[in-house]
């Protein structure tokens, strides 16, 4: 038996530690060499893409431009230098100022090519051809069990980015397009479709996030993970988009909607009109309590939305629910009257024992004599 102890110890030690974003410590072999000829290739093909008279050359120019920019992006992220701006300056470029369509890589904890993400299923890999290098931006939060700002998911948020090098000015500028909100890149007076990898940010999020590791624990020891009951915004809140809330079922986690997100993300209508909110809860907790917490947290999200503008999109909220999630949702939007209360108590609420603690009395009222949610417009059970 003792001969098994060392291999077992090694095995369990190898399971320790949280996953980390890719770090480029050495410039890839294919990206080594002088900057100038690669920069000139990128610039020359940019000029072709800017010229409507050379439209027949655009497909080849797009490929050559992307190939050159991929090499330059490797140099930007892998070469020595203190920060993105310093590394950009070292190769004669600059980082464009962030705006509603572009991220600042200095605000991300990691930015790396989408090709560095292990895609769960090649058959379900969703990508779009176009100009630029699909990339993933990662902003870290705290792990499961550690407090974090409200509506921030555990571990972090993944951004869907497309990296381009803009030669419109004397100094080429790196642009990190927020691919979820922008479709094209202006080159000269021509609009060119941006490349995208829709699956990479989703698969990387679930590689980093611990929620999907808690399915069994959430049933057997739900009290250990009640602090992770909550609503998580997959992207920063956008007051112009309709929330679509996804509520998982028994012995499950929000990753139950992973394939749906993967299929919907490439759709422009979905990205234009909707934002995704994932709801997580321990499924081993009594369903009436879970339903109460769902109502409370959706109401808190409503308060957050109204504090950041009007609630027109909130009143168009869509909820997708599955299994136990459907039970929670149906209960949350249905006026119980006194039916739920009288299923548990014979005395009227006002005649309950005076020795009952105030917090217990409030729990009964919130759990059984509540007012239903009114914001959701559409619910899919």
Locations of the language-model features?
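Bacterial N-terminal signal peptides
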Residues: 5-13
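Serine-dependent carboxylesterase/thioesterase catalytic core
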Residues: 18-23, 48-56, 60, 77, ...
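Short, surface-exposed alpha-helical segments at coil->helix boundaries
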Residues: 254, 258-262, 288, 292
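Positively charged n-region of N-terminal signal peptides that target proteins for export
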Residues: 1-3
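Short amphipathic alpha-helix adjacent to the substrate-entry channel of hydrolases
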Residues: 258-274
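Flexible, membrane-associating and regulatory peripheral segments of lipid-active enzymes
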Residues: 16-244, 253-259, 275-278, 310, ...
């Amino acid at each position: 038996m003792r001969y098994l102890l060392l291999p077992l110890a090694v095995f369990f030690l190898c399971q320790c530690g949280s996953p980390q974003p890719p770090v480029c410590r050495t410039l890839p072999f294919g990206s080594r060499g002088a900057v100038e000829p690669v920069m000139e290739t990128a610039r020359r093909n940019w000029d072709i893409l800017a010229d409507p008279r050379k439209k027949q050359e655009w497909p080849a120019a797009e490929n050559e431009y992307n190939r050159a920019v991929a090499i330059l992006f490797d140099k930007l992220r892998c070469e020595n230098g203190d920060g993105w701006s310093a590394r950009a300056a070292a190769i004669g470029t600059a980082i464009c100022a962030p705006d509603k369509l572009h991220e600042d890589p200095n605000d991300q904890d990691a930015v790396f090519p989408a090709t560095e993400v292990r895609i769960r299923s090649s058959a379900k890999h969703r990508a779009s051809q176009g100009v630029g290098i699909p990339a993933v931006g990662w902003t870290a939060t705290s792990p499961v069990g550690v407090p974090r700002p409200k509506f921030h998911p555990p571990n972090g948020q993944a951004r869907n980015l497309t990296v381009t090098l803009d030669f419109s000015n004397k100094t080429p500028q790196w642009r990190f397009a927020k691919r979820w909100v922008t479709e094209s890149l202006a080159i000269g007076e021509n609009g060119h479709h941006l490349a995208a990898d829709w699956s990479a940010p989703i698969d990387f999020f679930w590689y980093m996030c611990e929620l999907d590791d808690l399915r069994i624990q959430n049933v057997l020891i739900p009290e250990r993970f009640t602090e992770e009951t909550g609503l998580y915004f997959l992207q920063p809140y956008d007051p112009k988009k309709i929330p679509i809330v996804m509520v998982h079922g028994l012995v499950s986690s929000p990753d139950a909607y992973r394939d749906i997100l993967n299929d919907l993300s490439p759709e422009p209508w979905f990205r234009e009109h909707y934002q995704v909110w994932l709801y997580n809860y321990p499924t081993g907790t009594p369903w009436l309590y879970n339903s109460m917490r769902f109502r409370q947290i959706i109401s808190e999200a409503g308060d957050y939305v109204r504090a950041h503008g009007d609630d027109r999109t909130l009143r168009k909220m869509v909820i997708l629910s599955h299994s136990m999630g459907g039970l929670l949702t149906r209960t949350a939007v249905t006026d119980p009257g006194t039916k739920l209360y009288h299923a548990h108590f014979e005395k009227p609420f006002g005649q309950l024992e005076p020795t009952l603690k105030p917090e217990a009395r409030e729990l009964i009222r919130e759990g059984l004599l509540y007012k239903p949610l009114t914001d959701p417009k559409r619910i899919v059970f």
